[in-house]
């Protein structure tokens, strides 16, 4: 039975989810390395603005101040922090502790270096947030538009899966699946397309949707993701959102240069704008704050998988390289960057 929960990595999403679970009565501790943020959370609570305006009392601590063991870890640290955060988590786990990774990219293989596969679950999240400062985050989606999917790394449907789902249900709506890697590739497709383009242009997801020329680029990036996923032997799951399913494989699997721009815009208007229209890529937020971004865990994950599968991804490689250059200060993010991409 799950009694103690630790949420590792209390950024924009972690603060919101942790606050909602705290409000629902769960014994959860928000863990973070940002001292000012932890102090603000403990002193004044989690301030959530944007889609709602509420301050929720929470319990928070620094990673090196964790005490005892926890039954459930909601792992929301950036992949760039794994080398530090994972050993800290393992130190406070026991033989039955469950780890639910809500990270971007394809994080489970890395988590499995520290935790047995049968204790790992994955939870791609379908809502966004923007960190505002110590103790405060901007929620881009109203609570009734907050969704996530959940599955075990082994693909089994266990009693623990149901228990974790019941807990997460108090923070956002949960859809269960026996195809976690298919879920991961669905979310990775979304992030590698929209987050990457947001990072090089500075546009929010909604501003990308507003521009047909940007959505044409999204179509090309999405097609490359689909081809890599298929070549890797993975069946991509539909995107579960607003109690409906959206099939990226059908949308972005187009021949030649005939990108389905109108269809892509219509689908994004329906499934993405309600919850993510105001979202700004987390990679861009990291760059703006002088932090290392997850460029190698998002577009880089597609590039790595493409190399292993023998699939060409020329557009993804270009945007991945561009983000690296922006991160190094060799370029600045601006809308004009999108037109430097050669679509083929």
Q: Where on the chain are the PLM-derived regions?
A:
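Residue-level detector of anion-binding/catalytic polar loops
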Residues: 27-28, 47, 173, 235, ...
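Nucleotide donor/acceptor-binding cores
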Residues: 2-4, 71, 146
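NAD(P)+-binding Rossmann beta1-loop-alpha1 motif at the extreme N-terminus of oxidoreductases
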Residues: 1-53
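Conserved active-site and cofactor/substrate-binding residues in soluble primary-metabolism enzymes
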Residues: 36, 80, 106, 159, ...
């Amino acid at each position: 039975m799950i009694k103690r929960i630790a949420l590792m990595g209390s950024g924009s999403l972690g603060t919101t989810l942790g606050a909602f679970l705290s409000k629902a009565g769960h014994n959860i501790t928000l863990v973070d390395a940002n001292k000012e943020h932890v102090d603000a959370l403990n002193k004044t609570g989690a301030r959530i603005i944007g889609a709602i305006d509420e301050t929720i009392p929470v319990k928070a601590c620094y990673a090196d101040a964790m005490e005892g063991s926890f039954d459930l870890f909601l792992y929301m640290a950036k992949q760039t922090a794994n080398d530090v955060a994972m050993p800290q988590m393992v130190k406070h786990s026991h033989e039955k502790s469950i780890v639910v990774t809500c990270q971007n990219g394809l994080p489970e293989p890395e988590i499995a270096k520290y935790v047995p596969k049968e204790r790992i679950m994955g939870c791609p999240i379908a809502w966004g947030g923007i960190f505002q400062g110590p103790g405060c985050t901007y929620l881009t989606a109203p609570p009734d538009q907050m969704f996530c999917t959940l599955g075990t790394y082994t693909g089994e449907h266990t009693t623990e899966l149901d228990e974790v789902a019941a807990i997460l249900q108090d923070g956002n709506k949960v859809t269960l699946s026996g195809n976690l890697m298919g879920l991961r590739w669905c979310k990775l497709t979304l992030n590698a397309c929209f987050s990457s383009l947001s990072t090089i242009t500075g546009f929010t997801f909604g501003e990308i949707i507003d521009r047909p020329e940007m959505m044409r680029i999204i179509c090309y990036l999405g097609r490359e993701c689909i081809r890599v996923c298929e070549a890797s032997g993975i069946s991509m799951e539909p995107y579960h959102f607003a109690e409906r399913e959206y099939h990226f494989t059908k949308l972005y699997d187009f021949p030649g240069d005939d990108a389905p721009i109108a269809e892509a815009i219509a689908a994004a208007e329906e499934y993405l704008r309600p919850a993510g229209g105001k979202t700004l890529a987390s990679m861009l937020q990291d760059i703006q704050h002088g932090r290392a971004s997850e460029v190698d865990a998002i577009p880089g994950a597609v590039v790595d998988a493409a190399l292993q599968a023998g699939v060409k991804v020329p557009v993804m490689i270009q945007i991945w390289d561009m983000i690296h250059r922006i991160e190094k200060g060799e370029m600045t993010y601006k809308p004009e960057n999108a037109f430097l991409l050669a679509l083929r």
